[in-house]
Amino acid sequence: MTILGLWLVSSDNKVMYTLPIIILMFSDAFAALIGEFYSKYKFNTGFGTKSIEGSAAFFLTTYFICINFFLFFSDIGNINIVLVSLLLSILTMILEVISWNGLDNLFVPFFVYMFLRLNLYLTEKELMYKFWVMVILFVIIILNRKKTTLTRTAQTASLFFLYIIMIMGGIKWLVPPLIMYLGYYHITPKVEGQVKDSLKGLLAIAFTTSIWLALSIVMDKDKLFLIYIFSFSLHFGIINLIRDNAGNINRETFRMKFLMGSIGKALMFFIINHIILSGITDFKMLEGVIVLIFGGIFTYETVMKIYYIVEKEKELSGETKVFITSGIVFFYSLLLLGIGML
């Protein structure tokens, strides 16, 4: 399936077709071999177990393959070869780590193909810019590693997510997820004995927000950017509610003070991002944002209250709550899209 798909999209470009397959054949195989027989430092991704040694083997093999492949089969400059190989090796290593159930066999080669299409013939200056974006995001995540509830694997995935957002949409689209990543720990209530949030939860949030960036390629960019900000704002408000409810003993009762606090933080998140980043003055959509933030947060709280009335002794995991949140956010984002299309 992967080989057929690459053959269909590569349009007889030998580099675009061959390199993804070679990386899949050798990097993935060496990583699996090293991880199986020589690994000492293993970590749980939320979908299974990977090893630091296996990831390092994947990175080094990919880098070696890319350097030599470009030297022999491309006409790009030496500095460009190093930069493209380095960026591609880092990103595919992260993608391999966060893939599950063998889907790296699909994700990695198609990502390599897309990366080559977008980056192979960029100038040295453009590649250096992308490299420094990667370095800066990496430094931010390292400095913030103790001020987050994410597992280390999820933090690594957030680097991949933020980088892709930056490259596809630019700084404008990067700011909302970066503010959320850096701010939620400090602005939302602290939780005693906080269980680390998994990769699965991060992927759910990433999907329900980044889909609007993907759609902006073919639809109204300004309106979709407003929906993009809205989706992060609603996520932020519900996360505030989740963290506040973690210490709530009376789970079956509504607490209007805290509900309004979460709504206020969601609206503040939206207003700050909208004023700084979005110039849209579609008052119909802006009114819809206010109404739908109220509706989304009350919907989440109502779902939780009904659950706790029915299941008095059971507690939902944080991961499950994030899945529910992502579903609610996506639903209300679709409603806002409908308002924008009227």
Where in the sequence are the language-model features?
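Hydrophobic alpha-helical transmembrane segments
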Residues: 1-30, 35-44, 51, 55-342
